[in-house]
Regions:
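Conserved ABC ATPase signature
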Residues: 40-44, 48
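A short, proline-enriched helix->beta-strand linker immediately N-terminal to the Walker B motif
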Residues: 59-63
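Catalytic Walker B motif of ABC-type/P-loop ATPase nucleotide-binding domains
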Residues: 65-68
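Helical segment within the ABC ATPase nucleotide-binding domain
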Residues: 79-92
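H-loop/switch region of ABC-family ATPase nucleotide-binding domains
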Residues: 100-101
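A short, surface-exposed alpha-helical micro-motif characterized by mixed small hydrophobic
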Residues: 106-108
């Protein structure tokens, strides 16, 4: 795991191994799995692997984090641990663009919620309006099916 997180900062940003490892340990603690630092990815649960991926991305100090269905391949028990990390990132004002079907998560942390259908933007709104008073019929149908 440690090598997985430190490789890009050392190769791309040119930081020292010691600095990269210190930051990696801090990031693993931030995502709630500091004890996994010296394990192999194959020894981790799906939720732990996803949190390592988040730590790896954060190691590069991105301005924006992109997530494409970060919980889609996880067992139901693992979904909460990944969403909890993402909620913490949102509280720390990390800018995120998240593709998700986790509507409770979107309602809780999003500044804007956007619905696309067949490549077309259907609705973009605040979570309150999007979920409680959507402007478009397609959004209403989507919410009826998924909520």
């Amino acid at each position: 795991i440690m090598e997985n997180i430190t490789l890009a900062p050392m190769k791309v940003k040119g930081i020292s191994k010691k600095e990269a490892e210190t930051k990696a340990l801090e990031l693993l603690a931030r995502v709630g799995i500091p004890e996994q630092a010296y394990k192999y990815p194959s020894g981790l649960s799906g939720g732990q692997q996803q949190r390592v991926a988040i730590a790896r991305a954060l190691a590069m100090d991105p301005k924006i984090m992109l997530f494409d269905e970060p919980t889609s391949a996880l067992d139901p028990e693992m979904i909460k641990e990944v969403l909890d990390v993402m909620v913490d990132l949102a509280k720390e004002d990390v800018t995120m663009i998240v593709v998700t079907h986790e509507m409770g998560f979107a309602k809780e942390v999003a500044d804007r919620v956007i619905l696309f259908d067949e490549g077309m933007l259907i609705e973009e709104n605040t979570p309150d309006i999007f979920f409680d008073n959507p402007e478009h019929e397609r959004t209403k149908l989507f919410l009826e099916q998924i909520l």
